[in-house]
Amino acid sequence: MFRSHTCGELRLSDAGKSVTLAGWVQRARKMGGMTFVDLRDRYGITQLVFNEAVNAELCERANHLGREFVIQITGEVNERSNKNMNIPTGEIEIIVSVLNVLNSAVTPPFTIEDNSDGGDDIRMKFRYLDLRRNCVRKNLELRHKMTMEVRRYLDSKGFLEVETPMLVGSTPEGARDFVVPSRMNPGQFYALPQSPQTLKQLLMVSGFDRYFQIVKCFRDEDLRADRQPEFTQIDCEMSFVEQEDIISTFEGMAKHLFKELRGVELSEPFLRMTWADAIKYYGSDKPDLRFGMKFVELMDIMKGHGFSVFDDAAYIGGICAEGAASYTRKQLDQLTEFVKKPQIGAKGMVYARVEADGNVKSSVDKFYSQEVLQQMKEAFSAKPGDLILILSGPDAMKTRKQLCELRLEVGRQLGLRDKNKFACLWVVDFPMFEWSEEEGRLMAMHHPFTHPKEEDIPLLDTDPAAVRADAYDMVVNGVEVGGGSIRIHDSQLQAKMFEILGFTPERAQEQFGFLMNAFKYGAPPHGGLAYGLDRWVSLFAGLDSIRDCIAFPKNNSGRDVMLDAPAALDQSQLDELNLVVDIKEDK
């Protein structure tokens, strides 16, 4: 037996017991004739004491222990004279009588502490060391608890967990696939699934009316803080349901997770907002509702007064930051530079302060009378001490997106984006299609299997761009944590959808014939939803990136710097797969 207890287990009630512990040396320090060692394992830290007066040889051996040595000790639990109430074991220490060094260690390249001195790159290269840090371990423990609660909740609702294949056919619609060459079928390739979408629909055709799976998915796309090339979905599908049934079931699951994992009771129904309203008032289909600053459109008030920036604009809109009139000129200039950054793209920003006497002082006073500025103030319901920030531009959608970024930045600066406050809502009634400038055609906003709203089906023939989808996203604190839709279960409607998306009948049959054929054998009405497990965990843990809740993540270039992957294959492997590498140089 290597240990009788863990390093986070012993308490004052255990005083006098002989115990054996094993773990890693967090730190060792010599003070006079005593040596103190903090021993760490997954469960906590326990202080060890070596007394030179009692056993000089043992104490000398302890003096040679380095950081991250793996040791086993036996000793007696003793009450500490200088208690550390910041840790659960802080009232006791172990007077060591036996020390075994199980493994020595070279000095790690960064400190194994919550506030480590290691940067992102070095910690990812030595991820196995980074995982020893308490804060990282807690994220993975939270992830484990979440998957347990997900399974418990869905099992209680009659869902079956069914695994679907990892090697599937490629469907180029949407994000890029990761492809896998087949040795046994030269010149042919599998793809890693972007989601189990069509497979779970086939399970509905098969009669498995409530399916779920906690599943790895893969997308070869550009990365950012909330994306990884491989990620985990809580994937679910239900038969004989309408949108309201699905929303009710998975809102219930969200409330269950909040209660069990965060101790937060969400008794009220989640807010609902149409996609059109989300864009109109927040410039985003995933609005952060922890704070206000709803957009106000100012076209009728601000156009036609000789200020060409506004007079030539297709959209003028603003936000009102309560109590922020004290912003200095320097702060306002910094906000202007913020919105002018290339990734945001605004040309500038107009601001106006509401003074103590109710008058409005703006950066464009010479173009506007106080009467017009008062109309603007009333449009915002602004009060003395408030700050109004305005953007304009030739493209309404782009300008709203810029205003969204400004709103989020001001909310951050004012401390309104509290990570311990949760604002949940459903965004519904998405457009069925969106226009792709790159492709020169309509694309499915979600995927080709989304059912249009019944009342909009006639528009498929006359005005497909106006069709709304039976689709819904759950948004928490400005993060899309999940989304889904009612699916098409009629092969004729599915064929119509492929036609609008530019598929020839031959291409539709080649890529999705298996699904179209299945529908001919009696497909039930069905729909579903997929939650992003990584996003849920990072939200509950208060993280800025999903990378911190994944055991072995990729960096922003999609590389695993620890495994040095991806990497070139040996020529023998390429020959076996009948592959030739021909890298085209960028022109």
From Swiss-Prot:
<dbReference type="Pfam" id="PF01336">
    <property type="entry name" value="tRNA_anti-codon"/>
</dbReference>
<protein>
    <recommendedName>
        <fullName>Aspartate--tRNA ligase</fullName>
        <ecNumber>6.1.1.12</ecNumber>
    </recommendedName>
</protein>
<keyword id="KW-0547">Nucleotide-binding</keyword>
<feature type="binding site">
    <location>
        <begin position="219"/>
        <end position="221"/>
    </location>
    <ligand>
        <name>ATP</name>
    </ligand>
</feature>
<dbReference type="InterPro" id="IPR004364">
    <property type="entry name" value="Aa-tRNA-synt_II"/>
</dbReference>
<dbReference type="InterPro" id="IPR012340">
    <property type="entry name" value="NA-bd_OB-fold"/>
</dbReference>
<dbReference type="GO" id="GO:0005737">
    <property type="term" value="C:cytoplasm"/>
</dbReference>
<dbReference type="GO" id="GO:0003676">
    <property type="term" value="F:nucleic acid binding"/>
</dbReference>
<feature type="binding site">
    <location>
        <position position="487"/>
    </location>
    <ligand>
        <name>L-aspartate</name>
    </ligand>
</feature>
<dbReference type="InterPro" id="IPR045864">
    <property type="entry name" value="aa-tRNA-synth_II/BPL/LPL"/>
</dbReference>
<keyword id="KW-0067">ATP-binding</keyword>
<keyword id="KW-0030">Aminoacyl-tRNA synthetase</keyword>
<keyword id="KW-0963">Cytoplasm</keyword>
<dbReference type="GO" id="GO:0004815">
    <property type="term" value="F:aspartate-tRNA ligase activity"/>
</dbReference>
<comment type="similarity">
    <text>Belongs to the class-II aminoacyl-tRNA synthetase family. Type 1 subfamily.</text>
</comment>
<feature type="binding site">
    <location>
        <position position="219"/>
    </location>
    <ligand>
        <name>L-aspartate</name>
    </ligand>
</feature>
<feature type="binding site">
    <location>
        <begin position="532"/>
        <end position="535"/>
    </location>
    <ligand>
        <name>ATP</name>
    </ligand>
</feature>
<dbReference type="GO" id="GO:0005524">
    <property type="term" value="F:ATP binding"/>
</dbReference>
<feature type="binding site">
    <location>
        <position position="446"/>
    </location>
    <ligand>
        <name>L-aspartate</name>
    </ligand>
</feature>
<dbReference type="InterPro" id="IPR047089">
    <property type="entry name" value="Asp-tRNA-ligase_1_N"/>
</dbReference>
<dbReference type="Pfam" id="PF00152">
    <property type="entry name" value="tRNA-synt_2"/>
</dbReference>
<dbReference type="InterPro" id="IPR002312">
    <property type="entry name" value="Asp/Asn-tRNA-synth_IIb"/>
</dbReference>
<comment type="function">
    <text>Catalyzes the attachment of L-aspartate to tRNA(Asp) in a two-step reaction: L-aspartate is first activated by ATP to form Asp-AMP and then transferred to the acceptor end of tRNA(Asp).</text>
</comment>
<feature type="region of interest" description="Aspartate">
    <location>
        <begin position="197"/>
        <end position="200"/>
    </location>
</feature>
<dbReference type="InterPro" id="IPR006195">
    <property type="entry name" value="aa-tRNA-synth_II"/>
</dbReference>
<dbReference type="InterPro" id="IPR047090">
    <property type="entry name" value="AspRS_core"/>
</dbReference>
<feature type="binding site">
    <location>
        <position position="228"/>
    </location>
    <ligand>
        <name>ATP</name>
    </ligand>
</feature>
<dbReference type="Pfam" id="PF02938">
    <property type="entry name" value="GAD"/>
</dbReference>
<dbReference type="GO" id="GO:0006422">
    <property type="term" value="P:aspartyl-tRNA aminoacylation"/>
</dbReference>
<feature type="binding site">
    <location>
        <position position="480"/>
    </location>
    <ligand>
        <name>ATP</name>
    </ligand>
</feature>
<dbReference type="InterPro" id="IPR004365">
    <property type="entry name" value="NA-bd_OB_tRNA"/>
</dbReference>
<feature type="binding site">
    <location>
        <position position="173"/>
    </location>
    <ligand>
        <name>L-aspartate</name>
    </ligand>
</feature>
<comment type="subunit">
    <text>Homodimer.</text>
</comment>
<keyword id="KW-0648">Protein biosynthesis</keyword>
<dbReference type="InterPro" id="IPR029351">
    <property type="entry name" value="GAD_dom"/>
</dbReference>
<dbReference type="InterPro" id="IPR004524">
    <property type="entry name" value="Asp-tRNA-ligase_1"/>
</dbReference>
<dbReference type="InterPro" id="IPR004115">
    <property type="entry name" value="GAD-like_sf"/>
</dbReference>
<keyword id="KW-0436">Ligase</keyword>
